[in-house]
Curated annotation (Swiss-Prot):
Highest taxon, organism lineage: Bacteria
Keyword Protein biosynthesis in record: no
SUPFAM superfamilies: Translational machinery components
Residues spanning the membrane: none
Assembly behavior: Part of the 50S ribosomal subunit; part of the 5S rRNA/L5/L18/L25 subcomplex. Contacts the 5S and 23S rRNAs.
One GO term of the biological process aspect: translation
Keyword entries, A-Z: Ribonucleoprotein, Ribosomal protein, RNA-binding, rRNA-binding
PANTHER family xrefs: 39S RIBOSOMAL PROTEIN L18, MITOCHONDRIAL (PTHR12899), LARGE RIBOSOMAL SUBUNIT PROTEIN UL18M (PTHR12899:SF3)
GO molecular function: 5S rRNA binding; structural constituent of ribosome
GO annotation, cellular component aspect: cytosolic large ribosomal subunit
Protein name as it appears in the record: Large ribosomal subunit protein uL18
Disulfide linkage: none
Family affiliation: Belongs to the universal ribosomal protein uL18 family.
Length: 123
């Protein structure tokens, strides 16, 4: 008998499909994003150890006043510059994997990824 996943929402199924396709290994760290209508969150995760190495969001004290509870292109620029600052301070020698979660690679998600790529990070 076939296993049923009817208890999961479509976005949860999409997120699980995307995460299954990612290259999760010791030499790759995962950049995971989450967005809501008011905030945008980014984490750098080591899947082998199961820990978050660093994170940035619209709730950080440095950019909270600029964001004002809205997620738009300006907010994404601020969060990406904060994440680049934190990643460059870590001096990463490992490659990165971009985890878009259940979100399509358009709009704000692609703007964030391109901002990281333009700063010299490869994924």
């Amino acid at each position: 008998m076939k296993r049923s996943y009817n208890f999961l929402s479509n976005s949860e199924k999409r997120k699980l499909r995307n995460r299954a396709k990612l290259d999760k290994s010791a030499e790759r760290l995962r950049i995971s994003i989450f967005k809501s209508n008011r905030h945008f969150y980014v984490q750098l995760i080591n899947d082998v150890k199961g820990i978050t190495l660093t994170s940035a969001s619209t709730l950080d004290a440095k950019i909270k006043d600029v964001c004002k509870g809205k997620v738009n292109a300006e907010t994404i620029k601020q969060v990406s510059s904060l994440m680049v600052e934190r990643l460059s301070g870590m001096k990463l020698e490992q490659q990165l994997t971009f985890d878009r979660g259940a979100y399509k690679y358009t709009g704000l998600v692609s703007q964030f990824a391109e901002a990281l790529r333009s700063s010299g990070f490869e994924f």
